[in-house]
């Protein structure tokens, strides 16, 4: 059976620490804490990449960019996102739309959402209106609510570029 659309979902969480930049959707967010990770720890971009890969049953970002590989240390997640986008395009698919949510108690992310959407759209060769980015809190519940980390969820709709796919 052939399908012309595929849907994937993604999730990522990283711990908040001092002496690290806070980068979400490729945007540097002013904050006294940043996210700890092997790359730049951009949870939003990581969740989107996992959703893209998951839609095509291609595994997760750890398979392509393992945290044990020194070449990805400090990597810009937008560069990795571009590589994942090239991979799905080579498989005959393109993004129809993305919906995502970042969960953080602080800082307030609303002032940065348009810039996040614009940066992601530029890398993915999409229009900003194809990318939804929302922000919410965890109402002080769990590790995100205690400000121990930030997480993100993403859903991606892929559309076949090939009518026989």
From Swiss-Prot:
Keywords: Isoprene biosynthesis, Lyase, Metal-binding. InterPro entries: MECDP_synthase (IPR003526), MECDP_synthase_CS (IPR020555), MECDP_synthase_sf (IPR036571). The keyword Metal-binding applies. It comes from the Bacteria. CDD domains: MECDP_synthase (cd00554). The record marks 38, 137 as: Transition state stabilizer. GO terms for molecular function: 2-C-methyl-D-erythritol 2,4-cyclodiphosphate synthase activity; metal ion binding. GO terms for biological process: isopentenyl diphosphate biosynthetic process, methylerythritol 4-phosphate pathway; terpenoid biosynthetic process. It holds the Pfam family YgbB. 4-CDP-2-C-methyl-D-erythritol 2-phosphate binds at residues 12-14, 38-39, 60-62, 136-139, 146. Its EC number is 4.6.1.12. Its cofactor is a divalent metal cation. It catalyses: 4-CDP-2-C-methyl-D-erythritol 2-phosphate = 2-C-methyl-D-erythritol 2,4-cyclic diphosphate + CMP. It is an enzyme of class 4 (lyase). Binds 1 divalent metal cation per subunit. A divalent metal cation binds at residues 12, 14, 46. Pathway: Isoprenoid biosynthesis; isopentenyl diphosphate biosynthesis via DXP pathway; isopentenyl diphosphate from 1-deoxy-D-xylulose 5-phosphate: step 4/6. Involved in the biosynthesis of isopentenyl diphosphate (IPP) and dimethylallyl diphosphate (DMAPP), two major building blocks of isoprenoid compounds. Catalyzes the conversion of 4-diphosphocytidyl-2-C-methyl-D-erythritol 2-phosphate (CDP-ME2P) to 2-C-methyl-D-erythritol 2,4-cyclodiphosphate (ME-CPP) with a corresponding release of cytidine 5-monophosphate (CMP). Belongs to the IspF family. Homotrimer. HAMAP family: IspF (MF_00107). This is 2-C-methyl-D-erythritol 2,4-cyclodiphosphate synthase. It comes from Trichormus variabilis (strain ATCC 29413 / PCC 7937) (Anabaena variabilis). The lineage of its organism: Bacteria, Bacillati, Cyanobacteriota, Cyanophyceae, Nostocales. The gene is ispF.
């Amino acid at each position: 059976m052939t399908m012309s659309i595929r849907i994937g979902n993604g999730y990522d969480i990283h711990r908040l620490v001092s002496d690290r930049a806070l980068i979400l959707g490729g945007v540097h967010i002013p904050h006294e804490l940043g996210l700890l990770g092997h790359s730049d720890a951009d949870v939003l971009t990581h969740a989107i990449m996992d959703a893209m890969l998951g839609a095509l049953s291609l595994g997760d970002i750890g398979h392509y960019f393992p945290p044990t590989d020194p070449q990805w240390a400090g990597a810009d997640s937008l560069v990795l996102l571009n590589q994942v986008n090239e991979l799905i395009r080579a498989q005959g698919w393109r993004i129809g739309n993305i919906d995502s949510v970042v969960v953080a108690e602080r800082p307030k992310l609303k002032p940065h959402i348009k810039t996040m959407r614009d940066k992601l759209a530029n890398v993915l060769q999409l229009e900003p209106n194809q990318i939804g980015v929302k922000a919410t809190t965890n109402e002080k519940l769990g590790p995100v609510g205690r400000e121990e980390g930030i997480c993100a969820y993403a859903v991606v709709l892929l559309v076949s570029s090939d009518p026989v796919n």
